[in-house]
Amino acid sequence: MPGQISAVAVLFLSLTVILHGYQIREKEFPKARGYLQYTATSAEQITTKPLLQLINQRSHITLASRFKDDYIQMAAETSAIENTAHITMKTVTPVTTKSLPPISSASYTFVRSNNAHMTASSTDDTIGSGSIAHLPVPTTRASLAIVNYITGRATQLGGQTTLPKTFFTASHKSTTNQRPTLSTNVLGTSTPTHKDRSTTSPVPLVPRPTLVTWSSPAKIGTYEVLNGSRLCIKAEMGLALIVQEKDLDSATQRYFNIDPSLTHASGKCDSQKSNLFLNFQGGSVNITFTKEENLYYISEVGAYLTISNTEKTYQGKKNTLMMFETVVGHSFKCVSEQSIQLSAQLQMKTMNIHLQAFDFEGDSFGNVNECLSDYTVVLPMVAIIVVVICVVGLSVYKIRQRHQSSAYQRI
């Protein structure tokens, strides 16, 4: 019996000592116990286990945490009210769009001071399971404050910080053991490299004139010279240059037709003289018009030609001319070929020419004056036709006369 009483007394004494020690530990280390409770609660929440059914219980824990190296300061207030879980983030500029896994009830609020100059407007997003998180772009140093959602007051945190360039992101599909992954977004400007793919097309080489041994009709080109906005020279014609080379035994002629598509027309116009310049690869032609009272004519023609295979140049000028004379305001036309001897070795030939200089009414030719050579060709043809008609008429008349005389004799 005394042994049993001693055992009971020892047990009772042990319980008293344990209880007393527990009370002393409660008084001496409340902060450590609170920190351990918070650590256990936070670890349980981060692993995203099913939320505890907390009924009629409110716990408000205010946490101010800092990242290392003074990167970010943020205010956190955690509250657990029944089964509600939400996160409110105020961001400055949305950069990346990610989905965070289910997180316990915690409210994170970023507050920027008035002296922080940001270009983008703030946006509010509530983050839950499957929602979208917009993360801020760190462009300036902004002060952060702790916001108490119960009292509605904000406590300013001292110091300024620059938001880091590393953010926490998570995939859309979350599991119970999934943890946020680090996604580093390197912000900065980079100059893109553009490859210059523009190519300079080579300038086509126009061959120099090549002479041929046969004559062929030259192409008809239209050449105009303007005096300001008014037309002062207009010419429609075909041109050919003839090279004459004499040997000891014989003389040969070779031909070069001027191509209008490869010829550039220019010139100058005065009240009494006007010039038409025709430039092409390997040569040129210069025609001068002179005006006297109410008449005008071609007074000078010059040309030069460089042959491609021999690199030999032929040139000549005729300045005592009075060709294609016509009335001022009229145009001159000559269908037949006309030849001008410029030098002993160079000759110019015109064909189907129609030109006018000086006074124009609009952009069209005036009344046409034709050259005599055209008349010399036309008049013989007309005479031949008239003679043929007369012969046919006389023949018909004689035949009819014979028929009539034979009819009278029968009667």
Swiss-Prot record:
Subcellular location: Cell surface; Lysosome membrane; Cytoplasmic vesicle membrane; Early endosome membrane
Residue intervals passing through the bilayer: 377-397
Signal in keyword set: yes
Domain of life, per lineage: Eukaryota
A cellular-component GO term for this protein: early endosome membrane
Residue positions the entry lists as glycosylated: N227
Function: Lysosomal membrane glycoprotein which plays a role in the unfolded protein response (UPR) that contributes to protein degradation and cell survival during proteasomal dysfunction. Plays a role in the process of fusion of the lysosome with the autophagosome, thereby modulating the autophagic process. Promotes hepatocellular lipogenesis through activation of the PI3K/Akt pathway. May also play a role in dendritic cell function and in adaptive immunity.
Subunit structure comment from the entry: Monomer. Interacts with FURIN.
Assigned protein family: Belongs to the LAMP family.
PANTHER family given in the database record: LYSOSOME-ASSOCIATED MEMBRANE GLYCOPROTEIN, LYSOSOME-ASSOCIATED MEMBRANE GLYCOPROTEIN 3
Protein name listed in UniProt: Lysosome-associated membrane glycoprotein 3
Organism the protein comes from: Mus musculus
Lineage: Eukaryota, Metazoa, Chordata, Craniata, Vertebrata
